[in-house]
């Protein structure tokens, strides 16, 4: 079974509002099987029913990406922020139901990046352990709710320059196993794995059945095939892990402060990128097919 391949909505625009609905049809026209949409904020004014109608009509699947922050962090020292984090993750379940999505992925626990306005702060080992325990506690509360609704959260490790607690695949596995709910799995992103893992294929195989979402990104966050990633080995590892779920492309390329600031990305091109997207999609699909026929 071939994995569905999708594109993140930030490739086109952010925020994604009711004025952005034409990008759903564009994603399908480019050949993608699904779109990875940021969980809409109430102020975005997105009509969930209309999004669902268009996606169903186009045969376009939907995956959601959570947006945590300082005010909604289940790892926070502040009780109000922890409550905000739990409430937000519960809202993500509701949004997934309204939009017709099953997977909600992301770091989930909040407070990533100094670039997003968080002042640098040297966590001690004890503080990080406490934050990790709070993360497990918070996810243990919301993951069963997701499972009951037929949804699943994907906990994404981010590299050491962007967050704490979960930087590696092994750390994500540890949290997921500690929670022990079918409503929580692991989400992997090759951009971050390229910095943190000694072997990306080995990390994928170690994740195994815990893997619920996968992002195929180059080492420089550009289009697949323009960097150093060994897509054949990565696709083969996905097959060996028994992963048949969605594979999303996430090239952060927009000249937009709402994208650039949180990820410290300053070099966005100004040309039409549709052909690069098609080529990247074709490369990932070919790698998956090759892995299947040579397995």
Curated annotation (Swiss-Prot):
Catalytic activity: keto-D-tagatose = keto-D-sorbose; D-allulose = keto-D-fructose; D-ribulose = D-xylulose
Positions of Mn(2+) binding: 156, 189, 250
Reported pH dependence: Optimum pH is 9. The enzyme is stable from 8 to 10.
EC number: 5.1.3.31
Active site residues according to the UniProt entry: 156 (proton donor/acceptor), 250 (proton donor/acceptor)
Temperature dependence: Optimum temperature is around 40 degrees Celsius. The enzyme is stable below 40 degrees Celsius, but decreases with increasing temperature.
Binding site for substrate: 162, 189-192, 221
InterPro entries xref list: IolE/XylAMocC-like, Xyl_isomerase-like_sf, Xyl_isomerase-like_TIM-brl
Top-level EC class as recorded in UniProt: isomerase
Gene3D superfamilies: Divalent-metal-dependent TIM barrel enzymes
Domain of life: Bacteria
GO MF annotation terms: isomerase activity; metal ion binding
Function: Catalyzes the epimerization of various ketoses at the C(3) position. It is able to interconvert D-tagatose and D-fructose to D-sorbose and D-psicose, respectively. The enzyme is also able to accept other ketopentoses such as D-ribulose and D-xylulose with lower efficiency.
Record family assignment: Belongs to the hyi family.
PANTHER family in the record: HYDROXYPYRUVATE ISOMERASE (PTHR12110), INOSOSE DEHYDRATASE (PTHR12110:SF41)
Quaternary structure note: Homodimer.
Protein name, per record: D-tagatose 3-epimerase
